[in-house]
Amino acid sequence: MFKEYKIYKFFEQVKQETYKVVWPTRKELVASTLVVVVAVFIFSLICLVLDYSIHNIMQLLLNIGK
């Protein structure tokens, strides 16, 4: 019985905490999402350039003796 009370108390506290959360407005959410998408795109381009560069360097090094 005490265990059931602890579980109930836990979920009651979770419910109380969700009322304290300050949820972002739609405008803030869109802005944050846009920042993440742009950051991922830029990071992907950096990875692409690095991968392409390393590939070309390795091809150059492997073809030196041929």
From Swiss-Prot:
GO terms for biological process: intracellular protein transmembrane transport; protein secretion; protein targeting; protein transport by the Sec complex. Gene3D superfamilies: Preprotein translocase secy subunit. GO terms for cellular component: plasma membrane. Pfam families: SecE. GO terms for molecular function: protein transmembrane transporter activity. The chain crosses the membrane at residues 29-49. It is found in: Cell inner membrane. Keywords: Cell inner membrane, Cell membrane, Membrane, Protein transport, Translocation, Transmembrane, Transmembrane helix, Transport. PROSITE patterns: SECE_SEC61G. It is a single-pass membrane protein. The keyword Secreted does not apply. Component of the Sec protein translocase complex. Heterotrimer consisting of SecY, SecE and SecG subunits. The heterotrimers can form oligomers, although 1 heterotrimer is thought to be able to translocate proteins. Interacts with the ribosome. Interacts with SecDF, and other proteins may be involved. Interacts with SecA. Belongs to the SecE/SEC61-gamma family. Essential subunit of the Sec protein translocation channel SecYEG. Clamps together the 2 halves of SecY. May contact the channel plug during translocation. This is Protein translocase subunit SecE. It comes from Rickettsia felis (strain ATCC VR-1525 / URRWXCal2). The gene is secE.
